[in-house]
Amino acid sequence: MISDNARSGMQQAPARSLFNALGFTAEELKKPMVGIVSSYNEIVPGHMNIDKIVNAVKLGVAEAGGVPVVFPAIAVCDGIAMGHVGMKYSLVTRDLIADSTECMAIAHQFDALVMVPNCDKNVPGLLMAAARLNLPTVFVSGGPMLAGHVQGKKRSLSSMFEAVGSYAAGTMTEDDVLEYENKVCPTCGSCSGMYTANSMNCLTEALGMGLRGNGTIPAVYSERIKLAKHAGMAVMDMFRKNICARDIITKESILNALTVDMALGCSTNSMLHLPAIAHEIGFDFDISFANPISEKTPNLCHLAPAGPTYMEDLNEAGGVYAVMKELADIGLLHTDCMTVTGKTIGENIANAVNRNPEVIRPVDHPYSKTGGLAVLKGNLAPDGSVVKRSAVVDEMMVHEIGRASCRERV
């Protein structure tokens, strides 16, 4: 075991004395040591429940014969960081998370890892670390927030931004805005639409690095605690079978993730993070891959902000696996890719069922025949730009020439 480098032999007696200081028993020092990367904090709504997820993972690891050891990862709430200088500090945390997790894992010689992320830069940062370290690794996220309800309709954080705009336009009162403010984010979890956090958690599942439901089971459901226990058990099974992160994160699985991205209508930020993850395995992947895949991948979901459905609806409709089954049935996925279950994507999704064709459109009745993202190039963006095509209303999909309004700050 890798951990023997830090625990075994006379030379490591000083290290064992420090393990004794931590309360480790002699029996525990003979077992695989599993690092659990906890992104728990009390400033990000998507991370408020991570401590409970981590405790469940620990139980699963111990049940399967490993020794769970928790260490932290930082996480920023982009929603709270937005609108001031704090937003300049968000993206850099992705690489800080990757680098610091690498440092902790190698310094302490862990045999395997369970990553417990949830929000925007936290998920890709830990995926980058997983690919870099190439240990047996399973992801289990904190899960999505439930949608809020305002005046009888489901709402999410994007509704809050729209409410502020309506107030500025004089079409909504201050009391109306306050009602939105108090109701659109009713629980812990990553914001309830298909924004960056939920996009990346769903793509983690599509990559094969998370168990079924990783991207969609709501944060407050007991089912997520069970998922976390199973993640702890799964990483021990991977350890015994010597299935490592780079057996799962491959060129083919990244292309699968991009295909699922197009079908789900994920965040444009996925085109910032997938290339960074690909870089860790030596795959030269950039935004030029997007349009060819988009052209052949139907957009099957219109989750908020593109439409009136939310992550809880996607979960009830069959989740990411149901979307993948639709895509696999028309030959758009590499179904032989390995996953954290020890089975292939094809085996995992074989029995997946689309339980709500209004939430997950069948491939023969998509929202559009092309994917949710598109890359545009021109004089405004000579190196390319990404647009969430699935969230653009039809009347805006026209050829128009006009004067650009360029500003130093908005």
Stretches found by the model and what they are:
Residues 1-48, 53-74, 79-80, 85-90, ...:
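Catalytic or ion-coupling anion/metal-binding cores of large enzyme and transporter domains
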Residues 91-95:
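Conserved phosphate-coordination/catalytic loops
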Residues 96-103, 125, 256:
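Well-ordered alpha-helical segments embedded in enzymatic catalytic cores
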Residues 96-97, 118-122, 252:
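Short, glycine/acidic-rich beta->alpha junctions
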Residues 104-126, 137-142:
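A short, small-residue-rich loop immediately preceding and capping a beta-strand
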